[in-house]
Regions:
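Amphipathic alpha-helical dimerization/coiled-coil segments
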Residues: 96-119
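Basic, amphipathic "hinge/linker" alpha-helix immediately C-terminal to the N-terminal HTH DNA-binding motif
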Residues: 84-102
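Beta-hairpin "wing" of winged helix-turn-helix
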Residues: 70-84, 89
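Short, hydrophobic-biased segments on the C-terminal half of alpha helices
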Residues: 61-69
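Short, charged/polar surface micro-motifs in flexible loops or helix N-caps
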Residues: 35-39, 69-70, 93-94
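Short, Lys/Arg-enriched N-terminal segment that forms or immediately precedes the first helix
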Residues: 2-18
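Short, surface-exposed helix/turn micro-motifs that flank interaction/cofactor sites
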Residues: 44-45, 68, 89, 95
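N-terminal helix-turn-helix DNA-binding core of bacterial DNA-binding proteins
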Residues: 17-59
Length: 119
């Protein structure tokens, strides 16, 4: 019986990278919206700029829908160039959540970084 050889290093690396981005993307969107209101089309570019290209959001609608359904962000209607557009903003609940998660995230990242500095 022949076996298909799988590059597990590649799969593991991609899996970790995808999981990291999936976990950190909502926090980055909240961080962005804590600084400024944004149209949905602006969010991916601004997050990419914030992270020096390390995080690229493919599905900002999915992230924003989840954040909105949890009351962490809200949408205002705005008239721009004669068209009604939706602009996203963070809520008070979102700010509280961001503060809590930011502290937790920084602590976790620093702890993991310390493990790698031990070498």
């Amino acid at each position: 019986m022949s076996r298909i050889q799988v590059d597990t290093d590649y799969e593991l690396t991609k899996g970790i990278e995808m999981l990291f981005k999936k976990t950190v993307a909502p926090i980055l969107v909240l961080r962005l919206l804590s600084k400024q209101k944004c149209y949905i089309t602006e969010i991916p570019k601004k997050v990419e700029e914030m992270t020096d290209g390390a995080v690229k959001l493919c599905l900002p609608y999915t992230i924003c829908t989840r954040l909105r359904s949890n009351g962490l962000i809200a949408v205002d209607a705005e008239l721009k160039d004669g068209r009604k557009r939706q602009i996203y903003k963070i809520t008070e609940k979102g700010l509280d959540f961001l503060r809590q998660q930011s502290a937790s995230y920084i602590n976790c990242v620093n702890s993991v970084a310390a493990v790698f500095r031990e070498e």
